[in-house]
Swiss-Prot record:
Pfam families: Ribosom_S12_S23. Coiled coil: none annotated. Gene3D superfamilies: Nucleic acid-binding proteins (2.40.50.140). Protein S12 is involved in the translation initiation step. This is Small ribosomal subunit protein uS12m. GO terms for molecular function: structural constituent of ribosome. Residues 1-23, 104-125 are annotated as: Disordered.
């Protein structure tokens, strides 16, 4: 613990908050290309394989991004748009791919939560 004299001379140092999405450079989204698309097993107690893409962003950062939803058409050299948001059971995955933008298709036939998965409005009968 500092003495009163030390506090008068130097003061207290403010704690710096760590930036969770440093790769995005304070942008809401970033564009990138996928050098690799794979699956990864999550932490205990979960077990379903998570679809993961390694993405080289336009600012030369390499990150892992989660591909949400059921099924995807992403492959090597696909262009994807990235947003923040971690995947709780996958260590090191701190961002998501945005469906329905660039080469990553939306989910066809999805009715609920369409805006999150880039799905088109279904035709009314």
């Amino acid at each position: 613990m500092p003495t009163l004299n030390q506090l008068i001379r130097h003061g207290r140092e403010e704690k710096r908050r760590t930036d969770r999405t440093r790769a995005l450079d304070k942008c809401p989204q970033k564009l990138g290309a996928c050098p690799r698309v794979s699956t990864r097993t999550p932490k205990k107690p979960n077990s379903a394989p998570r679809k993961i893409a390694k993405v080289r962003l336009s600012n030369r950062h390499d990150i892992f991004a989660h591909i949400p939803g059921e099924g995807h058409n992403s492959q090597e050299h696909s262009q994807v748009l990235i947003r923040g948001g971690r995947v709780k059971d996958s260590p090191g995955v701190k961002s998501h791919c945005i469906r329905g933008v660039k080469d990553l298709m939306g989910i066809p036939g999805r009715r609920s939560g369409r805006s999150k998965y880039g799905a088109e409005k279904p035709k009314s009968i």
